[in-house]
Amino acid sequence: MASPGHILIVCVCLLSMASAEAPQEPDPFTYDYHTLRIGGLTIAGILFILGILIILSKRCRCKFNQQQRTGEPDEEEGTFRSSIRRLSTRRR
């Protein structure tokens, strides 16, 4: 029969092999900050260049900078809205 010392050694060996073979699960709170930083800088660069292209293309025009359409009737002289329009057109 096996002595208690041999059984103890076999149990210790089995426990050490069982703990060594257990797959290590990745820690869900460990983040790759380098990749996150590079991705953020890339997106920021693309949006910056897109903004510059939109500004330089002159297709984005402000509504109040456009001339009044010729088909619209002139508004009355005494209304509040017409006085605001007259004041805004004097700045040009």
From Swiss-Prot:
Residues with lipid group (S-palmitoyl cysteine): C60, C62
GO biological process: negative regulation of protein glutathionylation; positive regulation of inorganic anion transmembrane transport; positive regulation of organic acid transport; positive regulation of sodium ion export across plasma membrane; potassium ion transport; regulation of cardiac muscle cell contraction; regulation of cardiac muscle cell membrane potential; regulation of cytosolic calcium ion concentration
Post-translational modification (record): Major plasma membrane substrate for cAMP-dependent protein kinase (PKA) and protein kinase C (PKC) in several different tissues. Phosphorylated in response to insulin and adrenergic stimulation. Phosphorylation at Ser-88 stimulates sodium/potassium-transporting ATPase activity while the unphosphorylated form inhibits sodium/potassium-transporting ATPase activity. Phosphorylation increases tetramerization, decreases binding to ATP1A1 and reduces inhibition of ATP1A1 activity. Phosphorylation at Ser-83 leads to greatly reduced interaction with ATP1A1, ATP1A2 and ATP1A3.
Chain segments carrying region Disordered: 66-92
Keyword Zinc-finger applies: no
Family label: Belongs to the FXYD family.
Protein name (record): Phospholemman
Species of the source: Rattus norvegicus
Organism placement in taxonomy: Eukaryota, Metazoa, Chordata, Craniata, Vertebrata
